[in-house]
């Protein structure tokens, strides 16, 4: 998978690969609309990581949406998308023309009735081709766990209304192309990061070890986008986060022992979309999250929090 993920055990057991149950498959689709002929429904529903090559159309996207119940990571960076006209695509129950090299409208969002839509909530990461021209309306609407959209194209594809949520998804683009994306219509509010997404889960047994363990594993702190820390944290670890991790998108501290988020820890983390706070948290320091303008949704404060210092969430206008 393109998201580099390691599990660091700091109690001297070394580095273990993430061992969550995964089923990875790769298929080359020779004829558009025939993906489901290559596997059974039972096989499709067990796949978590899918790489597709060859030729796809809106029929294939409908099956990806409606079956493939556990699909988390979808890589179609080496697949082309063919034009399709008919009633068997992703649009609800009507004839529709789906243009070539476009992510179809409602590709991963199913209409339940006139006002209710259901996104594919299992999906966490998609990797799109450098040939994609459009991401059509509602393509990823309601995909509430889609944390990563990687686009291989150096210029932004056209983004149609409701196609992708800037409050949920960080967009990873080729080196040197983030300015072009920021100037694209409907792309202006997204968090753009150049290069490949990097995620790390660290279990700390010795306080202050976060920096040395990352470097020992060959990961520079500045490259980390998705950070999960378990175990013991001290001020040195928070200082590392504050001073050397500018590109954080998502942070999970729920299983660490910290009772205080120190002053200025996450100040001006401009890509930060969400955070899970330590369960035993008691205090949030001054300006701890100030200027995190993309931090959004509902922030759950642990029941033991008794102090939120001055300006802790100043400028976090998208938080509820």
Where do the model's predicted regions map?
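Amphipathic alpha-helical interaction surfaces in cytosolic regulatory modules
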Residues: 63, 84-87, 240, 264
């Amino acid at each position: 998978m393109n998201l580099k993920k390691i599990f660091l055990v700091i109690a001297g057991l070394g580095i273990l690969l993430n061992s969550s149950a995964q089923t990875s498959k790769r298929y080359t689709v020779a004829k558009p609309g025939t993906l489901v002929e290559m596997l059974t429904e039972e096989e499709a529903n067990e796949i978590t990581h899918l790489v597709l090559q060859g030729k796809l159309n809106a029929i294939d996207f409908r099956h990806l949406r409606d079956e493939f119940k556990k699909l988390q990571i979808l890589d179609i960076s080496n697949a082309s998308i063919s034009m399709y006209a008919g009633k068997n695509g992703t649009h609800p129950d009507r004839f529709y023309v789906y243009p070539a090299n476009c992510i179809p409208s409602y590709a991963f969002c199913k209409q339940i009735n006139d006002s209710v839509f259901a996104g594919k909530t299992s999906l966490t990461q998609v990797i799109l081709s450098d040939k994609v021209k459009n991401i059509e309306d509602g393509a990823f609407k309601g995909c509430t766990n889609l944390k990563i959209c990687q686009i291989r194209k150096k210029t932004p594809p056209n983004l149609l209304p409701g196609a992708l949520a800037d409050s949920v998804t960080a967009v990873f683009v080729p080196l040197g192309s983030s300015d072009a994306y920021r100037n694209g219509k409907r792309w202006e509010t997204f968090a753009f990061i150049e290069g490949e997404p990097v995620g790390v889960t660290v279990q700390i047994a010795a306080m202050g070890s976060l920096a040395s363990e990352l470097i020992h594993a060959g990961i520079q702190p500045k490259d980390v986008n998705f950070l999960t820390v378990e175990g013991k944290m001290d001020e040195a670890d928070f200082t590392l986060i504050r001073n050397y991790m500018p590109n954080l998108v998502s942070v999970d501290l729920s299983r660490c022992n910290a009772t205080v988020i120190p002053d200025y820890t996450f100040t001006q983390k401009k890509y930060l979309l969400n955070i899970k706070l330590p369960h035993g948290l008691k205090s949030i320091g001054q300006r701890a999250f100030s200027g995190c303008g993309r931090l959004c949704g509902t922030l759950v404060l642990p029941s033991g929090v008794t102090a939120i210092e001055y300006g802790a969430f100043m400028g976090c206008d998208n938080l509820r």
